[in-house]
Amino acid sequence: MAGCIPEEKTYRRFLELFLGEFRGPCGGGEPEPEPESEPEPEPEAELVAAEAAEASGEDPGEDAATVEAAEEGVQDQDPEPEEEAVEEEAAAEGEEEEEEEEAAAPGHSAVPPPQPQLPPLPPLPRPLSERITREEVEGESLDLCLQQLYKYNCPSFLAAALARATSDEVLQSDLSAHCIPKETDGTEGTVEIETVKLARSVFSKLHEICCNWVKDFPLRRRPQIYYETSIHAIKNMRRKMEDKHVCIPDFNMLFNLEDQEEQAYFAVFDGHGGVDAAIYASVHLHVNLVRQEMFPHDPAEALCRAFRVTDERFVQKAARESLRCGTTGVVTFIRGNMLHVAWVGDSQVMLVRKGQAVELMKPHKPDREDEKQRIEALGGCVVWFGAWRVNGSLSVSRAIGDAEHKPYICGDADSASTVLDGTEDYLILACDGFYDTVNPDEAVKVVSDHLKENNGDSSMVAHKLVASARDAGSSDNITVIVVFLRDMNKAVNVSEESDWTENSFQGGQEDGGDDKENHGECKRPWPQHQCSAPADLGYEGRVDSFTDRTSLSPGPQINVLEDPDYLDLTQIETSKPHSTQFLPPVEMIGPGAPKKAYVNELIMEESSVTPSQPERSGAGELLVSFNLGSTGQQICRMENLSPVYSGLENEQFKSPGKRASRLYHLRHHYSKRQRGFRFNPKFYSFFSAQESSRKIGISLSSLTRSGKRNKMLRSSLPWRENSWEGYSGNMAIRKRNNISCPDLPWDYKI
């Protein structure tokens, strides 16, 4: 076809393949039976005789006379010869049939062999609701078409065009045959439409349109801009998946809008108490958006009204069908160079411009002061029950649905608009399962690292973000949509203003424990409730985790082992630093430990060794202070010392006996929480060493390792039994003789 778009061949090819798999609602899963072939009529006797005469070279006239004479002779004969002739004829026919069967060879048979039955076709999408109103027919028709087409990887432009054409055909047809009249108290109630019958009509129209377009593909203008998107959603630890998302890059084509700039629509809905509200919003909100009068000139206000209309209609549906669920939602609508955002609840969207996170919205949560005042003014309350909740129930202050919580949980959306000047990188739309554990700067870091590692390939960015939220401890459903606003194949550069550095998550801290480098600083304001992940949730097998430094601890099991390389504290010269020998990386296990940790330098100076209290019981004590400066594994061993005791603050010391005198298990505290396993150590100082009676010196070297359930400490010292009084005396002086280690997540006393 002259003047056709370059993709027309691709579209035609898809339609051909699609029709091979999709035969409409009446096709079911079985092929249509083929019509049986009618038997050929037997040739008349005269024609057979004429053909035989031609073959023998005789005159047809003579043959005809012969035939007539034969017939007269037959009539004059007795009946007995007639019966014999019939028997002979039957025998001849039997011989002919046998000859035909013998002549019929494989491949030459007149009757084709039975064809094998084709495999059943995939089932058609089933409507998620049994009944709908007339106002919901358009959204339901579009959704059924798009589901079926996207199942076969239909191009979005073609899918939008087919869905629009099918929906128009359905809306123009007579829907009265699908209606279910409903009467209440003798008065006419709401007229509803049976969705199963509607679905049959939709798929029948879709099949018909596809057949027509294969023969004569209509000219369609192609969109000017396509936004590359990366989408991923997981159920995670929840029993059901209650998130829904919508991605409509061809908004104008889907609604046949010819007088508007290029438009795109993206949304995430996070349901609670059931999935019905999220499904309803994902199917009907964009349809309600287009129907608003102010949509052509004020999309932001149209979005707010669309939320309100969707909420009202779902509340009515919930009353008819006894539904008790709701959903939060965030919608981004792009028209030309304008970005419009509307939301209810705690689902969020963030914009990244020049490598920096830009705040676009503030989620609706009960702890917001304005939301709290609104709820209390209506007679409700906001209480703490694991989280701030409205009337002790829901942890969001606005949502679609939740009819039993109205008016405290309202469906009024907030909106915001911003101009896109071309410096924007991408948008991240996600539910609270993502933003509760990953803050904006961390998300930017994840995307930037992924693009650098994959040469700008953005197809798996959403998977990476979902994995980061899951590893950070999120147990909720997680849905992430990343909409790229520019070509990400170009070099990805983080702006100079950013606090992120390549080695932000390696090495120890040099700022006295302040972890600014690990988290970065957002240059623009952001809601404080989402600024960091829980500190007690660790990443399995990741050194560059985004949680607080405390989650990078070696894990719940620590072993102090022997090592021949140690520092002699008495041999340190003035102002000459010494360090231990570097060890190879040691494999570690535990929910809060990286897979590998490295031994960092252990630097000590002469000034760090000072005499302490006077000798007690013949043993001198040294107070040794130094900075290990590492969160990895350290080595510390004590040799030639007097007996040293280990224990925990506020814990009673228990000796394991002679045979286990070298192995002391330390008791720890554990607690269960909803998002996983949490370990709370209850001790705060590191080492307390006593001077040896043989005056050889004090040598320190300790190695910590992580296990899964317990922590243990072992030393090569000649431990010996001691009385309770001796133990009490040593425990009394323990607090005054210690080596402080502010950078380690746990400190031990020996």
UniProtKB/Swiss-Prot annotation:
Residues 46-55 have a biased composition (Low complexity). Gene3D superfamilies: PPM-type phosphatase domain. Mn(2+) 1 binds at D270, G271. InterPro entries: PP2C (IPR015655), PP2C_BS (IPR000222), PPM-type-like_dom_sf (IPR036457), PPM-type_phosphatase-like_dom (IPR001932). Its EC number is 3.1.3.16. Binds 2 magnesium or manganese ions per subunit. GO terms for biological process: cellular response to lipopolysaccharide; cellular response to xenobiotic stimulus; positive regulation of stress fiber assembly; signal transduction. Residues 515-524 have a biased composition (Basic and acidic residues). It catalyses: O-phospho-L-seryl-[protein] + H2O = L-seryl-[protein] + phosphate; O-phospho-L-threonyl-[protein] + H2O = L-threonyl-[protein] + phosphate. Keywords: Cytoplasm, Hydrolase, Magnesium, Manganese, Metal-binding, Nucleus, Phosphoprotein, Protein phosphatase, Repeat. Sequence repeats lie at residues 31-32, 33-34, 35-36, 37-38, 39-40, 41-42, 43-44. Residues 31-44 are annotated as: 7 X 2 AA tandem repeats of P-E. The keyword Methyltransferase does not apply. Heterotrimer. Interacts with PAX1 and ARHGEF6 (or ARHGEF7). This is Protein phosphatase 1E. It comes from Rattus norvegicus.
